[in-house]
Amino acid sequence: HKTTMCWVYDKRQANGSAFVYFGLQPIDSESEEAKIVIPYIRGVLDAMEIKHGPTHGEVMMTSDGPCLVEMNCRAHGGDGNWVPMVRGLNGGYSQVSATIDAYMDPTRFHALPDKMPSPFKAAGQECCLVSYSKGTVKSTPGYEVIRRLPSFVYLETRTGPGSEVDYTVDPFTSIGSVILMHEDKSQLQEDLVRIRQMEKDNAIFVYEKGVDMMRSPSTGNLSSLSGFAIGDRPKTVFTSSRASVYW
């Protein structure tokens, strides 16, 4: 088995929902998470007798250790918008190109490293766009601001003029995602902060006049998010330097 990327889902509270996707962060192959997850996933593949082709698995870290959520006999999803970033981080290859090499050029495939490089060749991550408002979109000035960011690689969205936007509470109400990558990690973080502030300021869209554009109560006082959470506060079951997992 070869591991071409390992990700941590960034899930947080927003708009009264306890688990909203804010993005995916690649993690170093020498990180504490990767040292647990990579051998675990390879053990799952062996147990399932999967020897050929790409796979995409999801693991939840619990107080009892890693727990398998799913194992798919396919490449990582997202319409492949992550491929340019992974190639940049890995130095020229991705799960897609590795799969092609496995079938078309075995010599090249076997020459690929056992797992992704440490450290990465650049900094990168996927930012899922979160809506704190609702209404009918008139224009999307925030898209051009995002496209001009130094670390911008790709914007994927189906939200445009005429679209109905609602509060983001799950993957289906996300307004899009942005792939960011830059050789300077501080630049990427600066751009990410800019996007998050645009979300909170409702600066990505201009809404139609005459439509009651409603703002999420969380944007008025982000510290009060817990007051709108559904059910009991989640309990931390695993914490590392990069991620906290709740149950």
PLM feature spans:
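Internal nucleotide-binding/catalytic subdomain
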Residues: 1-69, 73-76
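Short acidic, gly/pro-rich beta-turn/loop elements at beta-sheet edges
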Residues: 4, 16, 79, 137, ...
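Generic "edge-of-domain/loop-turn" microfeature
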Residues: 13, 66, 76-78, 134-136, ...
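Short, charged/polar low-complexity linear motifs in solvent-exposed/disordered segments
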Residues: 20-24, 84-88, 99, 206-209
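Short, intrinsically disordered/low-complexity patches at protein termini
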Residues: 27-29, 91-93, 211-214
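Generic structural signal for well-ordered, non-membrane alpha-helical segments
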Residues: 30-37, 92, 171, 185-188
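Active-site "cap" helix and flanking loop/linker of ATP-utilizing ligase/carboxylase catalytic domains
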Residues: 35-57, 72-139
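Peripheral (often C-terminal) accessory segments that flank ATP-dependent C-N-forming ligase machineries
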Residues: 98-247
